[in-house]
Swiss-Prot record:
GO terms for biological process: DNA-templated transcription termination; transcription antitermination. This is Transcription antitermination protein NusB. It comes from Dechloromonas aromatica (strain RCB). The gene is nusB. Belongs to the NusB family. Keywords: RNA-binding, Transcription, Transcription antitermination, Transcription regulation. One of its GO terms (molecular function) is RNA binding. Residues 1-21 are annotated as: Disordered. GO terms for cellular component: cytosol. Involved in transcription antitermination. Required for transcription of ribosomal RNA (rRNA) genes. Binds specifically to the boxA antiterminator sequence of the ribosomal RNA (rrn) operons.
Length: 163
């Protein structure tokens, strides 16, 4: 019998910090975007189904709905933004990485209150949890380039502070 670790269990009995409501919402947004992109689910059915999923009650519902709707409605703009920084056509990316890149780009465009490094870190964590083995490295590199375009002052200030 195979045993799987839950989100709160780790091999050395080291407890991970509890997930924030926004991090949980990002996970559900990613799952919804995957259902939309791969399974052809529509926005309304994703919004109706998500609250039934385990753990959704602890997620930031407002962030979930706004972000899911925003990514879907701005998909062309987000794909265009990401496409200038990738090494292949967008539709050749893994579905998980494509959804995470759209999510990260959406947040950079629409959530100025969230530092770009937080957005990138959240995208990396999502990719580690749901994506391919080294997908997080790719996502990190692409979103760093996106941040330099969408948030040039913030990126420059961070580089200046590191000196």
């Amino acid at each position: 019998m195979t045993t799987f670790l839950s989100d709160s269990e780790h091999p050395q009995d080291v407890k991970a910090p509890p997930k924030s409501a926004r991090r949980r919402a990002r996970e559900f947004v990613l799952q919804g975007l995957y259902q939309w992109r791969v399974g052809g689910a529509d926005e309304a059915s994703i919004e109706a189904y998500a609250p039934e999923m385990e753990g959704f009650a602890k997620a930031d519902r407002e962030f979930f709905v706004g972000t899911l709707r925003g990514v879907i409605s701005q998909q062309e703009k987000l794909i265009e933004q990401v496409s200038t920084h990738i090494d292949r056509p967008f539709n050749e990316l893994s579905p998980v990485e494509a959804c995470i890149l759209m999510l990260g780009s959406f947040e950079m465009l629409n959530h100025a209150e969230t530092p770009y490094r937080v957005i990138i870190n959240e995208a990396i964590e999502l990719t580690k949890a749901f994506g391919g083995t080294d997908g997080h490295k790719y996502v990190n590199g692409v979103l760093d380039k996106v941040a330099a375009i969408l948030r040039p002052d913030e990126v420059a200030a961070r580089k200046q502070a590191k000196k």
